[in-house]
């Protein structure tokens, strides 16, 4: 679910931002001017890009509208970004469960309507594991990767090469058997202000990038309903 809303009178005690259905949870919130483009990604390896104005503003108690169609009950959204149409310096970084990642130009993600299947953003295989993170980055940023074992590395974004959407990317971190990525985050250029506990890392030389063919799957959608119901997209979209 995705929604737009204004917070003109915030209270010290906080306000209700969204109604959460049973079994669901809030993943992310982003500050925006209402004129950006939204990207959402799911762990099965797809992402969608749509204009923010396609989402009508709703009240704080609303559930929101459908942003992207998930594959099944085990699939879920793993990342959300808001990108400016004028910002050509940013790329989209994706990271998989087994430590693979890559950067892809934003323009490789075609603009569609919300609620569709989107397009492939990483080639998910048994080797890569599920998609765990999506973020917009600059070459001057750093990437922080934290593993379930507690190991954390920091590496420069400019060390991660660009690749097409339908590839698995390069190995960003070597994991011990049974370990996997727990969280990812980015930090801007802060000089030498790195945490002493963080191990400075480099992108692995195991840069096996594999391309796959793309397929299209039509998506049917339904019309808008009231603020307290799920709202699906109005136009057909496809997955590549």
Predicted regions and their residues:
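Short, structured "edge-of-domain" segments at secondary-structure transitions
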Residues: 3-240
């Amino acid at each position: 679910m995705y929604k737009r809303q204004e917070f003109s009178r915030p209270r010290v005690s906080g306000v209700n931002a969204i109604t959460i259905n049973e079994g669901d949870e809030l993943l992310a919130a982003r500050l925006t001017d209402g004129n950006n483009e939204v990207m959402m990604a799911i762990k099965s390896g797809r992402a969608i890009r749509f204009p923010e104005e396609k989402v009508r503003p709703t009240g704080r108690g609303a559930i929101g509208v459908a942003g992207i169609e998930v594959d099944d009950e085990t699939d879920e959204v793993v990342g959300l970004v808001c990108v400016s149409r004028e910002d050509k310096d940013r790329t989209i970084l994706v990271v998989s469960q087994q430590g693979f990642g890559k950067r892809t130009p934003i323009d490789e993600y075609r603009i569609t309507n919300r609620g569709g299947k989107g397009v492939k953003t990483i080639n998910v295989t048994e080797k890569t594991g599920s998609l765990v993170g999506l973020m917009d980055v600059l070459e001057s940023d750093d990437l922080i990767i934290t593993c379930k074992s507690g190991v954390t590395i920091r590496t420069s974004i400019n060390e991660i090469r660009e690749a097409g959407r339908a590839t698995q990317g390069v190995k960003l971190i070597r994991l011990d058997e049974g370990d996997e990525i727990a969280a990812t985050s980015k930090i801007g250029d802060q000089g030498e202000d790195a945490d002493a506990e963080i191990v400075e890392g480099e992108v692995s030389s195991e840069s096996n990038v594999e391309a796959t063919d793309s397929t299209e799957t039509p998506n049917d959608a339904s019309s808008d309903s009231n603020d307290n119901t799920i709202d699906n997209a109005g136009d057909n979209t496809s997955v590549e």
